[in-house]
Swiss-Prot record:
Enzyme's top EC category: transferase
Gene name as annotated: mtgA
UniProt topology in membrane: Single-pass membrane protein
Localization in the cell: Cell inner membrane
EC number assigned by the record: 2.4.99.28
UniProt entry tagged with the keyword Acetylation: no
Organism this protein belongs to: Jannaschia sp. (strain CCS1)
Protein name from the UniProt record: Biosynthetic peptidoglycan transglycosylase
GO biological process: cell wall organization; peptidoglycan biosynthetic process; regulation of cell shape
Amino acid sequence: MAKRARKSKKNVSRARLLAQAMRRWLLRGMFGLGALMLVWIVAYAVVPVPTTIYMQQERARLGGIERDWVPMDQIAPVLARSVVAAEDANFCLHWGFDMTAIRDAIADGAARGGSTISQQTVKNAFLWHGRSWVRKALEAAITPVMELVWPKRRVLEVYLNVAEFAPGVFGAEAGAQHHFGVSAADLTARQASLMAAVLPNPQRRDAGSPSDLVNRRARSIADGAALIRADGRADCFAN
């Protein structure tokens, strides 16, 4: 009996030691991943995003993509305002999450809604597309860190360079060339509002040959872009 008891205690001790070792390695792994992500975020604060998971998926699906990174000062300010008006009118007012929009989306039972430009930038630049609790959790963890490290103008600059404006067409420059044959710097207010109107679904909406829905949406976006310029909600990314 005494031998059995001692053996049982040894087994319990070994199990505890194993559990403690696993916890230590798990914590180290989480710390290492966190540190790696922080380095990644800091790097993208100053260098162009070279590619994304979704871009590579589209490249494999389509056989190629169109993309040309340009700095913010080579993107028409009216496009920046149009995109913010369309996707996240309170972009300059929040810290990564628009709690009012989230509450409204929950109350309305919306499948899509409440996702800020900051969250979309994290999803596009660092993560992957698709509905997943894992991705959502990572997005929620990374977004406030990115907001602390990057100025708002940089967040929008990255977003405008990695967002898809047509199937396999990424970024404002490639989108402007694809739809209108002009550079992103030379977009008119009308063209900018049409490009912003396709962002929720660039696979089905076409800025170059807009449907009635896209035209109506573009007119609304143009009004919104003028409004956020007038009331100061575009100040955080203005030249």
